[in-house]
Amino acid sequence: MSAAESVDQLIERFNLAQGELVKGNAEPANELFSHREDVTLANPLGPTAHRWDEVAAAGEHAASQLRDGEMVGFEAIEKYITPELAYVLRVERAKAKVGEGEDIAPMALRVTMNFRPEEGTWKVVHRHADPITTPQPVESVIQE
């Protein structure tokens, strides 16, 4: 199987795993991450997780804040694949009950993921997700 086919297969598996995450189950997504020391996760709920134990815990925490959800769509922006490294930039859209809320709420995340082959299987080595999907004023970066 070519690198492009393998990465596309991993992305499809990750899409399905995200469907589980918005139902409160982090395990399928966590299985797709590298377990090596250089793996990272930067999600909207906290500081960057670095190393497998922190990444797994951050994924579990994110899943614990979501329930009764479903993925609505994935909007590909760019994808680049080499035999040794690949990345995808996209917008992920979902709806779920968030935190203590009882209403299903729409969510959108701008996501970058990096992948690499490890022992014959492609893995996620970095994921960054944030809720910025529309233009923002420069003042939005100010923290008081």
Task: Write out the residue ranges for each language-model feature.
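Short beta-strand edge/turn micro-motifs at domain boundaries
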Residues: A108-V138
